[in-house]
């Protein structure tokens, strides 16, 4: 066997094995599993500090998962202010409509899901500053 073929087999083996290791972030299509958007809304609904209105999900941009004490899901999303008032309304993805012509933020939430306990925990939530932009048909 030539050196090139042997090297190629080693590289392919490492790639195949590393994708199965716990702790490695794996990409998923955002529309494959409806739970991804549920977890995005769960993360968004917890953000009430220094806000008068809840934000709501505009677009779920990307999803990655990592197996560590359950499964961590890294959700990258575009969010903007909704019509629901904090302290008056309860957050609901069905009732909290996106306000018109409001700036949006790019946010990343890490949600931990423990399927054996049916438990979801928000581990982190970070956003960019609010910016105005053209609302695309995503």
From Swiss-Prot:
Disulfide bonds: 84-96, 107-127
Localization of this protein: Secreted
SUPFAM superfamilies (alphabetical): Cystatin/monellin
Keyword Protease applies: no
GO CC, one annotated term: cytoplasm
One Pfam family it belongs to: Cystatin
Domain Cystatin intervals: 32-116
UniProt GO molecular function: cysteine-type endopeptidase inhibitor activity
Induction: Up-regulated following blood feeding.
Superkingdom of origin: Eukaryota
Tissue: Salivary gland.
UniProt entry keywords in alphabetical sequence: Disulfide bond, Glycoprotein, Protease inhibitor, Secreted, Signal, Thiol protease inhibitor
Homology family: Belongs to the cystatin family.
Additional note from the record: Decreases symptoms in mouse model of mannan-induced psoriasis-like inflammation by modulating immune responses.
Function: Inhibitor of cysteine proteinases. Inhibits host cathepsin C (CTSC) and L (CTSL). Suppresses IL2, IL4, IL9 and IFN-gamma (IFNG) production by different host T-cell populations. Reduces IL6 and IL9 production by host mast cells. Decreases nitric oxide (NO) production by host macrophages. Decreases dendritic cell-dependent antigen-induced proliferation of host CD4 T-cell. Impairs host leukocyte recruitment in vitro and in vivo. Probably decreases apoptosis in host cells. (Microbial infection) Decreases replication of tick-borne encephalitis virus in mouse skin after infection, likely indirectly by creating local environment that is less supportive for viral replication. Suppresses ERK1/2 (MAPK3/MAPK1) phosphorylation and apoptosis in virus-infected mouse dendritic cells but does not significantly affect viral RNA levels, indicating no direct impact on virus replication.
PANTHER family in the record: CYSTATIN
Name recorded for this polypeptide: Iristatin
Native species: Ixodes ricinus (Common tick)
